[in-house]
């Protein structure tokens, strides 16, 4: 503040001085007024003619005004008869003193003004260079942002669904509140705590809640903030960060995405002389050099613990590793209750139903779901958020936005309907498959149609039967195309299904030991640089086993569809008519039961006979039209 006042005073003085000088010059020389310069002889002629009204004589300078209003000035010479001439012609004249103090001071300032201006410019540039030098020296300063205990409003009440992690960190909160309680008994609080978990599970929020509960300063920094283009900057920032922590102890330092700086040493293009490794070395030294009474605790977060350096994870640095996983149904319900407090909801909205229908959602996904539901309700001009808004938001997140502007031809709709019906029939006939939530032929995202399945319960592992069922369901679309239209009419719509099936089958063979010929061995990914090189024979064997799994799944899907061909036709016809069907409606169609379908106008009962087919083929007219359109397209 003092420096700011000094700068303001300096510039105000300069502005006032320049203003005074300009005003004095304007006063004496008539700046801004047009003055006409004339010769002294011409001036004498004008006096004799009586055209001069008044003049001012200052030394050898004469300025005045003619009777016509024109201003003039001239330089006088040694002319002793000037005063009598002026009196004779009744010219009003005034003699000014040229050697007064103000005039002398003004002349001095005028003569020194260019030099003073140069000195001022030089001082200005020197200050700018000095400020630039200070900015350059701040490269080594820490970029950690301080969140004081007053501004941090997040507490454990704002964190839900990760009760085990909160229990683990409660000890740290107690230490930050009462460090002497532990030190009296000789106990040492963990110097570092590493939060491990997928993105969106609340690692950063949990760290802020710890600082909010303990009422201590909270420093936040990203792992990428340490490394710059200059050598040694990262290590300097680490030192400065820990110095700030010691000054504000007890405090909490949170390093987000620590894998950016804590990656395993000796791996990468930099080798052992990498700037990142110097930063990591300094971080290791600073963490190991803490004393128990300093009250500075490091909490870091990462979703890639496998790439961290082992020295960073040893006891004495990050003593505790807390895994934060995707919340289960109970955790999702608690998270939704926290977010639903912020929006008005309809009385019939049940949090348990929403939580049951969002398996695999992280805390960030659930927050996004609630926000999307509120936006959808506002777009529909509602006063509260209803179940329909939550369901629409969930479908939008899981399946993508509806592409209503995409116009599909009838033959393309027919192909898509049978493709999705193939997925639906195979899924419904396999007990190990997840229940179907919804099937649609409305284009969503990059898909022309899809069958979305949702598990009834949270899973921590998968059985071989479940994986085989997923392979069969994935190949159900291609199998339906072959059964109904033949091999020549199969489409590229199964590209995503084939990719998904290939990835699953390869994982079964190379990761989970579900191939008798390959055996229970881990081979890893083909593009993994840490993976050992496979022999040609083993690589061919793996490819052969993967192909066999997918081929068997395609054969099994074809068998299921041939045995349930009437159900396949009914479901395809219903998809063409209604475009979207729920899981219960698909089950009713598979069993030939009537079901209620709510349309835009009313509730229409679709009977079994209205969707039945006379034989095991599609309507002849429809097929003939489709084949004609496809043949025309091939010719074009």
From Swiss-Prot:
Signal peptide as annotated in the record: none
Record: active site: 420
Molecular function in Gene Ontology: ATP binding; ATP hydrolysis activity; ATP-dependent peptidase activity; metalloendopeptidase activity; zinc ion binding
Cysteine pairings via disulfide bonds: none
Principal location: membrane
Amino-acid positions noted as binding Zn(2+) in the UniProt annotation, renumbered to this chain: 419, 423, 497
Cytoplasmic topology ranges: 1-12, 126-636
Entry EC no(s): 3.4.24.-
GO biological process, one term: protein catabolic process
Keyword line: ATP-binding, Cell inner membrane, Cell membrane, Hydrolase, Membrane, Metal-binding, Metalloprotease, Nucleotide-binding, Protease, Transmembrane, Transmembrane helix, Zinc
Cofactor note: Binds 1 zinc ion per subunit.
Subcellular location per the Swiss-Prot or TrEMBL entry: Cell inner membrane
Topology class, membrane: Multi-pass membrane protein
Cofactors required: Zn(2+)
GO cellular component: plasma membrane
Membrane-side (Periplasmic) residue stretches: 34-104
TM segment ranges: 13-33, 105-125
Broad class of enzyme this protein falls into: hydrolase
Binding site for ATP: 197-204
NCBIfam families according to UniProt: FtsH_fam
Family to which the UniProt record says this protein belongs: In the central section; belongs to the AAA ATPase family. In the C-terminal section; belongs to the peptidase M41 family.
UniProt subunit comment: Homohexamer.
Free-text function comment from the UniProt entry: Acts as a processive, ATP-dependent zinc metallopeptidase for both cytoplasmic and membrane proteins. Plays a role in the quality control of integral membrane proteins.
HAMAP family: FtsH
Name the record gives this protein: ATP-dependent zinc metalloprotease FtsH
